[in-house]
């Protein structure tokens, strides 16, 4: 069966599970069947060239720009119910402890028994005697088997020490004219988690196969936190009486253990945000260094070839291995590939070069170029999605000028505080000139503004009441003022200047450090990234970001993104 969101149209994966006996041990046979896109999209044909150029599907609130033509993504390749479809299967044996003891890959034709949604499956798992279960009695035992293997895999995940940040994904609901009607949080239930763990297991098997056969590929790697980020987070934790274990090289388990310790604290959200910001971004690379956040020694993307080009490359590599051959991408115009790297990657490259540990140009392969290209296009797609969402949110809130809302401080900078509004899930800036007549010091370690005269503090996750004062659609910015202060002008001449203009004109808060580095935005890859390798969230990034603001708490993830 396939299990996806209500609005999904391209079905990459289908799952099946049954209990099996291996010797005296009770185990599970987990089958993850993935659409065989590589059968239809051949190297260097027109479809392949276009797919490589895009590298990923781009998800917007009301539409999707697919990596592949819809006749493939929603038709021939999509694992629709009651029709035969070509797949590449990962057939694995999972122990009761959640360990994959054996696996094999093979091409197969499947006939999906049903197209299920997360909510339908969650209802069945929550009540096997309920109306949803009564509608599909033949499927219930199979779903319970999947639920059992999920619990086993989840047990192994906890023992492994994988990090599981609790983040909120939002969903933008638009009317027929494309205008936002409401923004609502997307609930992540047990059905999401079942699929996530199944996809993670298949992705790990794919990476292991590449390693065992010494076949090159694009691994999904996630480096451990940098020395600079560790210093920042340890300084912050020390000030609140906490410590991150692990010394100079903490493990994912050290992070997970600390998160477990602070879970019940009133400042748990702030602490999670600071830990999240110490992370690096996951990227694609032929050089496997493991996945820090998921605590895997090797990890690759295999489960979403309809919407991610690296998964298609992994499929081609696996098929070559099955045939006893080697797949080497050829005929690719290197000059046409995206070579943009993130700031963090650029810093690491400079550091490696200074230490003489960098990869020399003569040693770079086509796989290196493809890893950089796919990583860059993934970031580009994310930025495009956020930009559209930001504009829509600005358009949504421009009718609410002068209205008051409660919210939480989601970012602190030298020029003000960013506030995410409750219920609306929209973010705006309260410029430092709107915080009162006090002179504010910016504490980089604590991520707070502190008034020198009054001692008033504004820190991440503080609750405030604000008023919408201005919306700049072109700049995608929302200006707020603290409620109870000077009345905001909301119409006619004399509208307050935009926060962007104020940020340029006003003297920013004095930083307590010579250089206050803004934290890089990090999206744990899962969900999901945490979640698993997931379809791009169609909502969640708030509008109103200033160019040089500190990163705000992550508000993402959906199905299987990691």
Language model features with spans:
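Short nucleic-acid-contacting surface segments enriched for D/E, G, S/T with interspersed K/R
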Residues: 398-405, 439-466
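A short macromolecule-binding patch
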Residues: 425-444, 489-495
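A subset of signal/propeptide-processing and intrinsically disordered low-complexity segments
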Residues: 306, 517-520
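Hydrophobic/aromatic hotspots within intrinsically disordered, low-complexity regions
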Residues: 495, 504, 521-524, 528
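OB-fold/S1-family single-stranded nucleic acid-binding modules
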Residues: 100-106, 421, 460-496
């Amino acid at each position: 069966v396939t299990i996806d969101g209500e609005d999904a149209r391209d079905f990459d994966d289908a799952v099946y599970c049954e209990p099996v006996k291996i010797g005296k041990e009770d185990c599970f046979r987990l089958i993850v069947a993935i659409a065989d896109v590589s059968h239809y999209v051949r190297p260097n044909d027109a479809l392949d060239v276009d797919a490589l150029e895009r590298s990923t599907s781009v998800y917007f609130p009301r539409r999707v720009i697919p990596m592949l033509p819809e006749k493939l993504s929603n038709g021939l390749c999509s694992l629709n119910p009651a029709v035969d479809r070509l797949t590449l299967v990962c057939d694995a044996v999972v122990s009761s402890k959640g360990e994959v003891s054996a696996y094999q890959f093979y091409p197969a034709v499947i006939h999906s028994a049903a197209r299920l949604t997360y909510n339908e499956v969650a209802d069945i798992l929550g009540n096997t005697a309920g109306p949803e279960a009564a509608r599909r009695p033949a499927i219930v035992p199979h779903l319970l088997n999947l639920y059992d293997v999920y619990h086993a895999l989840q047990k192994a995940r906890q023992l492994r020490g994988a990090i599981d940040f609790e983040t909120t994904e939002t969903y933008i609901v638009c009317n027929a004219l494309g205008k936002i009607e409401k923004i609502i949080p997307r609930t992540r239930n047990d059905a999401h988690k079942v699929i996530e763990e199944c996809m993670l297991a298949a992705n790990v098997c794919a990476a292991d196969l590449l390693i065992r056969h010494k076949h090159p590929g694009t691994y999904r790697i996630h480096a451990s936190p940098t020395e600079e980020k560790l210093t920042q987070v340890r300084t912050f934790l020390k000030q609140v009486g906490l410590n991150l274990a692990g010394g100079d090289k903490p493990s994912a388990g050290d992070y997970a253990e600390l998160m477990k310790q602070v879970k019940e604290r009133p400042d748990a959200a702030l602490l999670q945000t600071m830990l999240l910001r110490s992370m690096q971004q996951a990227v694609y690379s032929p050089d496997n260094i493991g996945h820090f956040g998921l605590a895997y020694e090797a990890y690759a993307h295999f489960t979403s070839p309809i919407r991610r080009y690296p998964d298609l490359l992994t499929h081609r590599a696996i098929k070559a291995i099955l045939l006893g051959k080697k797949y080497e991408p050829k005929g690719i115009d290197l000059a046409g590939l995206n070579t943009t790297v993130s700031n963090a990657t650029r810093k690491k490259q400079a550091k490696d070069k200074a230490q003489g540990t960098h990869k020399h140009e003569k040693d770079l392969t086509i796989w290196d170029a493809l890893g950089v290209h796919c990583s860059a296009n993934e970031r580009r797609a994310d930025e495009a999605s956020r930009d559209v969402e930001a504009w829509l949110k600005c358009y949504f809130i421009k009718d609410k000028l002068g209205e008051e809302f409660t919210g939480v401080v989601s970012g602190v900078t030298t020029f003000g505080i960013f506030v995410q509004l409750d219920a609306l899930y929209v973010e705006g800036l309260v410029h430092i000139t709107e915080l009162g007549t006090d002179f504010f010091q910016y504490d980089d370690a604590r991520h707070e503004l502190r008034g020198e005269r009054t001692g008033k503090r504004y820190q991440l996750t503080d609750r405030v009441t604000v008023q919408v004062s201005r919306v700049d659609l072109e700049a995608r910015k929302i200006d707020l003022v603290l409620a109870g202060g000077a009345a905001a002008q909301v119409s006619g001449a004399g509208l307050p200047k935009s926060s962007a203009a104020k940020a340029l004109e006003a003297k920013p808060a004095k930083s307590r450090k010579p250089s206050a580095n803004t934290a890089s935005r990090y999206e744990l890859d899962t969900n999901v990234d945490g979640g698993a390798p997931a379809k791009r969230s169609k909502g969640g990034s708030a509008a109103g970001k200033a160019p040089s603001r500190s990163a705000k708490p992550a508000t993402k993830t959906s199905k299987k993104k990691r």
